[in-house]
Structure formats: structure tokens, C-alpha cells
């Protein structure tokens, strides 16, 4: 009772501050709720008379008895409604083992809505004996399993999670489960400790497969891999024959595409020969035509006799109508023979002379 007298001020000091809308009963309830939360070293004695707030104006004995009777706790009612845990009982977990679960299993809600799991009841902790576990500092408790996490993720000891089997999904028969879920057989991937709920062993996937399997499911014309040596599949092999030439360009397996884009050397020569000779000689009695204007200009010099290219060698006064003729003539003075035969040691100053010589080796 000493704590009650030191904790609460007198009513006279409270009334001196101003009018309060709360009555004395409200203050009494507030004081008792605070005492229930901040309990001392032991539980209150039920045999002790109820606590009172001292005031200068003490009410009559009849009023005090009525208030004490109203404020007294109904212990029988509270003890029957709130039952503590069984002695020596451990917190129950409703999660199934991975081998027994056939679908998505969730643990049911706890049976009682009172205190935390594994702890004493509300009233049992308040009204129990002094050596009750509620008055001792609680030891470290294991965390209650999450309602939406599989038992393999709970900290309780559980068997080693198995690896979930993955394989490419083919639309043909025997392709496993449909609808984009992971199949059960094929390429095995070990399940990590922090893997999602759907990747644990014994639990089916609760969501569609990721989008990285799209190249296996978008194209309906695919067939299963043919029996033979296992090779790493590429993305182009999964697209099919119809999509290679249209969107990704031709490959070595499409000879028609290469034939259209890259013409052969023979085709280029024929195309060069078919070019129209637009430049025609206008000299009377000469109907020659040329594809280049420079060739026609050199030809006209034969009709006019013009020879603008003169040899600069000392003592040589030869002149030529074309520059290539002057170049061949100048090699006679220098003795230069740049065209050499690869089959014999002979060399020539003109390319046409080398061509005639190569015919002898044939």
C-alpha cells in the first residue's frame, strides 16, 4: 500500500488544478490497470483488502463497501475463461513434414488468443504463486513458425531439403505439368536455404514459372529433343526454321539467302559486260563506242594525231597519245620488269607479255 500512496497525488491537489471530467471511480480503475501492468516483485495477495485512494474527504462506510464490491475482481470467472498451458507442455506446431505434405499446407491459428505462444495465461501470470514462471525473466524462446513459410525454413530441426527437378517444358505428351509450372523430373537444381516457398521439396509451385523459360513455351511447334548425344541447346535452335530467315538473318543452313545477297564473280563479270557503251566515236566512218569517256578521248587522238605524252629520257623524242603507252616505253630505258613468272625465273615489262608466257606452261 505504500506504493499506492507514493504513486498517486492527493485528490485535493488534482482539484486545485481545475475541474476534471473524470470521477473517482475512473481514477480508481486507471490506478488498478497501471498496477496490473507494472507489478512489483510478486503477485498481489487475493486475501488483502482492495486498494483505495486516500482523500481528504473520506466517503461513508456504506459508499466505500459498495465501491469495493464493484471493483473486486471476479477471480472465478477469469480463471475459467483463461486457461494456462498444461504443465510441461511444449508449443504445438501444426506444420507437416515435407514428405507428408501433398499440397500447400498452412498451420491453423493458435487455439488461444491470450498471451504469446509458450507463455502462461494472463490471469495465471498475475495470480500464480511467487515462484511461477511468469515472474521470472523468460528464457530465450524459439520463434513461432510463420504461417506462410514451409517447415524447411523454420528454425526447428528439419530434414535436409531435397533438390527440385527442372527441365525444359515441351507441349508434347509426357511433358510434365502444364500451365507453366515446374516439372518434377529433368535437370536438378539444389534448393538453397533461402529459396522461395514454391522451390522447396514436397511443395508444388504456387506461381507460374519465371519468364526465362519463355523460349520453351512460346513456340508451339517444338518437339522433344531427339535421342542422341546430349549437347547444350542454343537459343537459335529453339526458334524453329521459319523465324531464322525473317528476323535474325540468314545462316549457313540457308543457301538460298546467300545466293540472293552475294552474287558470284561470274555474275559480276557478266553484269560489267552488259553495261551499255554510251560513248560513241563521232569521226566519219568510225562507229566505235566506249563505256568511259576517257577511253573515247584517247581513241579520238588516233584520228586527230595528237600525242600529248612525250618521253623525258635524254636523247629520246618519242611521243604517245596515251599515258600507259608512255609508261611501257619508259621501262625499256630503265630495264624494269615488274611482271615475273611464278613457274620460271623469267620477267616481263608488260602484263600482256606475261599472259602470253603463262600459256606455254599450260
From Swiss-Prot:
It comes from Homo sapiens. The modification Phosphothreonine is found at residue 23. The keyword Ubl conjugation applies. It is linked to Anemia, congenital dyserythropoietic, 4A: An autosomal dominant blood disorder characterized by ineffective erythropoiesis and hemolysis resulting in anemia. Circulating erythroblasts and erythroblasts in the bone marrow show various morphologic abnormalities. Affected individuals also have increased levels of fetal hemoglobin. Anemia, congenital dyserythropoietic, 4B: An autosomal recessive hematologic disorder characterized by neonatal jaundice, hyperbilirubinemia, ineffective erythropoiesis in the bone marrow, and severe congenital hemolytic anemia. Fetal and embryonic hemoglobin are increased and persistent. Changing residue 325 to K: In CDAN4A; pathogenic; has a dominant-negative effect on the transcriptional activation of CD44 and AQP1 promoters; the orthologous mouse mutation alters DNA-binding specificity resulting in ectopic transcription of non-erythroid genes. GO terms for cellular component: chromatin; nucleoplasm; nucleus. SUPFAM superfamilies: beta-beta-alpha zinc fingers. The lineage of its organism: Eukaryota, Metazoa, Chordata, Craniata, Vertebrata. This is Krueppel-like factor 1. A motif (9aaTAD) lies at residues 71-79. The modification N6-acetyllysine is found at residues 274, 288.
Amino acid at each position: 500500500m505504500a506504493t499506492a500512496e507514493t504513486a498517486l497525488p492527493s485528490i485535493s491537489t488534482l482539484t486545485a488544478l481545475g475541474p476534471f471530467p473524470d470521477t473517482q471511480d475512473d481514477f480508481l480503475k486507471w490506478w488498478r490497470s497501471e498496477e496490473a501492468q507494472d507489478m512489483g516483485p510478486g503477485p498481489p495477495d487475493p486475501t488483502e483488502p482492495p486498494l483505495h485512494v486516500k482523500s481528504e474527504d473520506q466517503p461513508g462506510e456504506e459508499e466505500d463497501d459498495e465501491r469495493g464490491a464493484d471493483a473486486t475482481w471476479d477471480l472465478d470467472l477469469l480463471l475459467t475463461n483463461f486457461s494456462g498451458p498444461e504443465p510441461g507442455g511444449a508449443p504445438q506446431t501444426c506444420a507437416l513434414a515435407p514428405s507428408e505434405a501433398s499440397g500447400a499446407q498452412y498451420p491453423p491459428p493458435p487455439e488461444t488468443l491470450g498471451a504469446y505462444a509458450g507463455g502462461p495465461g494472463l490471469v495465471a501470470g498475475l495470480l500464480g504463486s511467487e515462484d511461477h514462471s511468469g515472474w521470472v525473466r523468460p528464457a530465450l524462446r524459439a520463434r513461432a513458425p510463420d504461417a506462410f513459410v514451409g517447415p524447411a525454413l523454420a528454425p526447428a530441426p528439419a530434414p535436409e531439403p531435397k533438390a527440385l527437378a527442372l527441365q525444359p517444358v515441351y507441349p508434347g505428351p509426357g511433358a510434365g505439368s502444364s500451365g507453366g509450372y515446374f516439372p518434377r523430373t529433368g535437370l536438378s537444381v539444389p534448393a538453397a536455404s533461402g529459396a522461395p516457398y514454391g522451390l522447396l521439396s514436397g511443395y508444388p509451385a504456387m506461381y507460374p514459372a519465371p519468364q526465362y523459360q519463355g523460349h520453351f513455351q512460346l513456340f508451339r511447334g517444338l518437339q522433344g529433343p531427339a535421342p542422341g548425344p546430349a549437347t547444350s541447346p542454343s537459343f537459335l535452335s529453339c526458334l524453329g526454321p521459319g523465324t531464322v530467315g525473317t528476323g535474325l538473318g540468314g545462316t549457313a543452313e540457308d543457301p538460298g539467302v546467300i545466293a540472293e545477297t552475294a552474287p558470284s564473280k561470274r555474275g559480276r563479270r557478266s553484269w560489267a559486260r552488259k553495261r551499255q557503251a554510251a560513248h560513241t566515236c563521232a569521226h566519219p566512218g568510225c562507229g566505235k563506242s566506249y563505256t568511259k569517256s576517257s577511253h573515247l578521248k584517247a581513241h579520238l587522238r588516233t584520228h586527230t594525231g595528237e600525242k600529248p605524252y612525250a618521253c623525258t629520257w635524254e636523247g629520246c623524242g618519242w611521243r604517245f597519245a596515251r599515258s600507259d603507252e608512255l609508261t611501257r616505253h619508259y621501262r625499256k630505258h630503265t630495264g624494269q620488269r615488274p611482271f615475273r613468272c611464278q613457274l620460271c625465273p623469267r620477267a616481263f615489262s608488260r602484263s600482256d607479255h606475261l599472259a602470253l608466257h603463262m600459256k606455254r606452261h599450260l
